[in-house]
Structure formats: C-alpha cells, structure tokens
C-alpha cells in the first residue's frame, strides 16, 4: 500500500509524538512526513535529523503548498483558524485545536461548504476524552451534557491552595477563556451537535496530579457517565498524552481497510 504523505503544523508535544510513531512505532512504514512547520526553528532541528528528506519551515503559509495527502494541525487555535477552511481545498485535514471551530464564528459552516465541494474531509480526533462515539450515536436524543474538567494548577497556570471552580457555563465562553486547555469541550459539543446542550465546568485542584474529564449525559436512550484520568505529556503539562495518541490512531485508521467504532 502507498504510504500516506503527511504535512504537520506544530512540532510540540502532539506533533513530536506523531513523528516518533512514524519513525519507530505504529505508523512506521505507513506514513511519510513531507513537511513540518513550526515557528520555533530549534524544534525543527530534531525533525531534520530524524527525517532528512522531510522539508521544514517556520512559515505557516508553506503548509498550504505541501504535496501531501493529509495536513495535521497540532499548533494552536490561531493556526487552525488561519489554515481553515482553505486547507480543505488541498488536503484532508486533522485539527487538534478543535476550539477554533467553536470560537471562530462561522468557521465550522465554511469548512462544511468547502468539504462538500472538494470531497476532502475535516477530521476531529477524540483527543483527551472517550465517549464521543456514544454522543454522536445519541445525536438528537440528548437532553443535557455536563463536562467537568479537573486539572492541577500547573496545567492551568493558576496559583490556588484549594479546589476551585474557575468556570461554569457555555462551551464557547469556556474555549474563549481557556483556549489552550479546553479543546475537549469543543469536541464534545461537536459530537452532540448542539453546543447549547453542553455545560462546561473547569476546576483547578492542587490535590490532583493528572488531568481528569468527567462527561455526564442525560438522553432519551439512557444515562451515561464517562470518567477519564489522563497523564500529561512529559514535556507539556497542558496536554494529555492520550490526545497525542488519538492523533496517531486517527492517522493509522486512514491507512487501514477496516475501521472500528462509529
């Protein structure tokens, strides 16, 4: 089978995890990186050692001209908003900074329009949570969803001495106030299909050492509760390791003939 060619925007924790899996893991022999963009030149030096034939750039615009099958955005909400929807004219796109689709007014609908014309797809990985397949299956039957995210102070850049509720409210305001920490809320709302059904609660707790997400669902088909306690990436306390692995899994799925899950 022909290798999947990949353009990557963002060589941080998630991007580096994906590249490591291409080099010596579950994506080895299946995926070929053709371009890596990052605004920090020092991060690109390691990539150049790993993949001598892969182009690197500090200019985001170069990603749009890459000869790739898939573009993976793993940089920031700002980068995602800059790339979309135009990137869908050239590639399938995997977006990790899902908050951009909620925060930027009209961006999601513009992405849909471009995807319908070009046939390219916008992929939203599960990220740091599970249960998105259930939420998608229940679309139209959900009465309410509550997402509680609990993180240690270092993950939220807060200095608190006791468990503190930092925010409770809508998905859009949660993403606006915590853009680097709350892509989970955006992914949940996209799976549900109606952000107004989702209430987000963000808690800072000095007694915890891992990122925890609790999703509680009331629907006509049943009541559901998902709790995930995620270790952070060693070099990025704001990102759950499983979020990076979800990107790896989605890319791997693109190379396989059998797909498991909704």
UniProtKB/Swiss-Prot annotation:
The keyword Signal does not apply. Keywords: NAD, NADP, Oxidoreductase, Pyridine nucleotide biosynthesis. The active site is at 213. The keyword ATP-binding does not apply. One of its GO terms (biological process) is NAD biosynthetic process. Pathway: Cofactor biosynthesis; NAD(+) biosynthesis; iminoaspartate from L-aspartate (dehydrogenase route): step 1/1. InterPro entries: Asp/hSer_DH_NAD-bd, Asp_DH, Asp_DH_arc, Asp_DH_prok, L-Asp_DH, NAD(P)-bd_dom_sf. One of its GO terms (molecular function) is oxidoreductase activity, acting on the CH-NH2 group of donors, NAD or NADP as acceptor. It catalyses: L-aspartate + NADP(+) + H2O = oxaloacetate + NH4(+) + NADPH + H(+); L-aspartate + NAD(+) + H2O = oxaloacetate + NH4(+) + NADH + H(+). Its EC number is 1.4.1.21. NAD(+) binds at residues 128, 183. Pfam families: Asp_DH_C, NAD_binding_3. PANTHER family: ASPARTATE DEHYDROGENASE DOMAIN-CONTAINING PROTEIN, L-ASPARTATE DEHYDROGENASE-RELATED. Specifically catalyzes the NAD or NADP-dependent dehydrogenation of L-aspartate to iminoaspartate. The iminoaspartate product is unstable in aqueous solution and can decompose to oxaloacetate and ammonia. Belongs to the L-aspartate dehydrogenase family. This is L-aspartate dehydrogenase. It comes from Methanopyrus kandleri (strain AV19 / DSM 6324 / JCM 9639 / NBRC 100938). The gene is nadX.
């Amino acid at each position: 089978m022909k290798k999947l060619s990949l353009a990557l925007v963002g060589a941080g924790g998630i991007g580096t995890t994906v590249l490591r899996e291409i080099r010596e893991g579950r994506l080895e022999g299946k995926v070929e990186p053709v371009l890596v963009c990052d605004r920090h030149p020092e991060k690109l030096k390691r990539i150049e050692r790993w993949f001598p034939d892969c182009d690197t750039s500090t200019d985001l615009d170069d990603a749009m001209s890459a000869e790739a099958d898939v573009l993976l955005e793993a940089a920031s909400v700002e980068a995602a908003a800059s790339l979309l929807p135009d990137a869908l004219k050239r590639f399938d796109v995997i977006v990790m900074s899902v908050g951009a689709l909620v925060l930027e007014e009209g961006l999601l609908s513009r992405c849909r329009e471009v995807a319908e014309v070009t046939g390219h797809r916008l992929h939203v990985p599960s990220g740091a949570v599970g249960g998105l397949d259930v939420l998608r299956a229940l679309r139209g039957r959900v009465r309410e969803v509550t997402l509680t995210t609990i993180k240690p102070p270092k993950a939220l850049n807060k200095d608190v001495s006791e468990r503190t509720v930092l925010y409770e409210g809508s998905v859009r305001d949660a993403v606006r106030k915590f853009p680097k920490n709350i892509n989970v809320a955006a992914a949940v709302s996209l799976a549900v299909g109606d952000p107004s059904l989702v209430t987000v609660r963000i808690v800072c707790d000095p007694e915890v050492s891992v990122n925890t997400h609790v999703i509680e669902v009331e629907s006509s088909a049943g009541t559901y509760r998902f709790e995930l306690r995620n270790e952070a990436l060693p070099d990025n306390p704001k990102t759950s390791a499983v979020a990076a692995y979800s990107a790896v899994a989605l890319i791997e799925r693109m190379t396989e003939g059998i797909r498991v899950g909704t």
